[in-house]
Amino acid sequence: MSCGSIKPAVVILSLVLLGSVFLQVSYSQGPNVTTSTTDPKYEAARDQFLKVWDTLTFHPIVAIFVNESAELGNGVYQEHSNVFNPDETITLYAQPVGFGHKEITEENGEKLFLMNFTADIILTKQDGTPIGGGTNIPAGQIMSHYRNTELFLHLSLTHDNPLPKGEYKVNYNVTDQISGNTFKITKDLKVV
């Protein structure tokens, strides 16, 4: 579904920026990581954490409007109010937890984990009349050697023509394609 001239754009990033890599790896490495020593306490704690992770409901622990920025990272953003200029891009930062991992074995026998998300992003008037957006937007896939538990989504709406001044709602439905679970976020915003 595409309405009007408003275009959704979705960016999913995990382990992409050098600054995020080292922090992420410290949480994501499993027992098969090549190191000079193994840490049985870490492995036991990680195994216990993943058992709890598997019981979590898929939902965002953070879901806020953010300023567009060249700096993207897990927990790295500059918060934006819900008041926008008519020609401003509307960007939501969401940090989900409780998503699934699908184990995949490559032809060479290498074990990887797939994380896969899609999103519906619909801008409406306050009365629910759709103005623009899209559905079933590929939000990205991540293939990793580890069951990553930290990632973020930047869900953006851009538009060709300035939005009329007024009050709106943005409805986000994010689906974890591995588990089939979805979470919904509705954000009010004002264009001045």
Please state what every model-predicted region is.
Residues M1-G30:
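Secretory targeting signatures
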Residues G30-V192:
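Intrinsically disordered, low-complexity terminal regions enriched in Ser/Thr/Pro/Gly
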